[in-house]
Amino acid sequence: MEIQDEVDLLEPQESLTASADSTVDRALSWLLDAQYQDGYWAGTLESNACMEAEWLLCFHVLGIANHPMSRGLVQGLLQRQRADGSWDVYYGARAGDINTTVEVYAALRCQGYAADHPDIKRARDWIQLQGGVKQVRVFTRFWLALIGEWPWEETPNLPPEILFFPRWFPFNIYHFAAWARATLVPLCILSARRMVVSLNKKSCLQELFPEDRSAVVALRKKNGAWSAFFYHADRALKKYQRMFKRPPGRQQAIKMCLEWILRRQDADGAWGGIQPPWIYSLMALKAEGYPVTHPVMAKGLAALDAHWSYERPGGAQFVQACESPVWDTLLSSFALLDCGFSCTSSSALRRAVDWILDQQVLLPGDWQQKLPTVSPGGWAFERANVHYPDVDDTAVALIVLAKARPDYPDTARVNLAIERGLNWLFAMQCRNGGWGAFDKDNDKDLLTKIPFSDFGETIDPASVDVTAHVLEALGLLGYRTTHPAVAKALEFIRSEQESDGCWFGRWGVNYIYGTAAVLPALASLNMNMNQEFIRRAANWIVGKQNNDGGWGESCASYMDDTQRGRGPSTASQTAWAMMSLLAVDGGTYAESLLRAEAYLETTQTPEGTWDEPYYTGTGFPGYGIGRRELKRQRSLQQHAELSRGFMINYNLYRHYFPLMALGRLAALKGT
């Protein structure tokens, strides 16, 4: 169908078009007002109550009494408590999460809340209904061990000697995902030192252990040959360590861990750009005798006050699990470009592109362990995380630079950045044709069997959504399906398509996100969009549209297949669905697109943005192997509450994705 035919189908909706124009104008005004003077955007990143609870526990471990943020963090925790007494992993979850609830419970008791306080009692009653504290994950046990409420002997042993392992060894730290690796190293110090800063008698958690503690805390043996092997290996290692109070090489191993940590502190004071390695590194340094006044410690704590925390009404304070200024700036710039902005007509876009170019990482990182001869050239997700650039941000950076290049005054600078980014991306392609997030071929399933790995995801295999974003960038830069890397990536994407036509979303919720990543990528490569597998995907999208014209999908879809593409409509997921259909054939799907346009127009706030309490970003689906695998559901100890998962509400998703969709729809109409 020719573009002219598509426009004809859309032209009768003149009043809607005028309304949509004002919707876009208001949204653009809001976005431009949200830009920082330096040229970037940074929306709040909401996650779950473990963030605030763990910081309160960390203050206790570090010996920081009455931290200025403590009262606000406590208020934030109380605001999030569910009616049944629990705390959940994401907004709208069907049930609370045992791990989050126990950690919050411990944090509130640590802050002086009595065991008979109504909120504490409600939480405790809920915990006991779930089977008690014995149900918690390994990471929660680590926290309880740090405050003297769980024996270190009954946590998985994390020997610092793992840093001695050569690169070819299956348990070399560089086989773990970047986020797991950066967390594992400081935990090795804490595990080796058996660090304990006990709660006072009034705050101890004896009420959570109504039965004999020894029966509650015993490390559970999991099913499966490898899991059994690691269980017995852990027992043997602990016996060995009891025999040798100072195992040979232990001090040298701890020193290596310490040096590893110190070399990787970010410029803003955090570690790894995310909360877990940051908070565990601070405690590991404390275990090694670093006072909180030491420059490294002071810098790490200062970041918390500087820009990682945010406030909400009622005196509540929260801490972000991560910051996303690079990601937010890339996608905000993408939205401006989709709305017809250029670097010559818009100083805001020009400043954003300047800032993006400045963020390219040209320093070595952990990824070079597998690619020692490859030059840097990627972009990171966070504010100051030069050690861990990622493929997804790099792909979107190349998309933005490719679109902005014609009107950017320094073409040579853009060309050099694109060349460096492309070389890095091609080198990062995995053997199966896809791309992971932070490393090449980070897919050793064996690592998921060790007792430490009962949280989120331990490895970082190739994913469809990241691969699709790379292909979209390559298409914009002139690559086509005949290029070997593109052809191999397309094979991977085709192999991952679900039987009903959609694709799984590793980094966004969920099948709507995965499908919305793939279809624009295929269009970017100038593929024939009438192919059966493509139309099947588009028809799946159409079939999931809600009666209000929008689309939504619950985080529960990661564990409940009946929730695929189902959920209350959200602005971001509606935009993803729209961009999917626009990539395939805007004319054929005009009715769905116009209903979606009306949904966005009628739900826009007077300020020009959209409300979106639902979480549409994904950190960890919780399968433990970095990819979709519902066959493991029984062994996961996870249901729709996603107790192993980590879900995210990117506060700017609700804004720049609708702008992209509306901008592309306007371009199709010729308005």
Name each model feature, range by range:
Residues 1-671:
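Preference for long, amphipathic alpha-helical scaffolds in soluble/luminal domains
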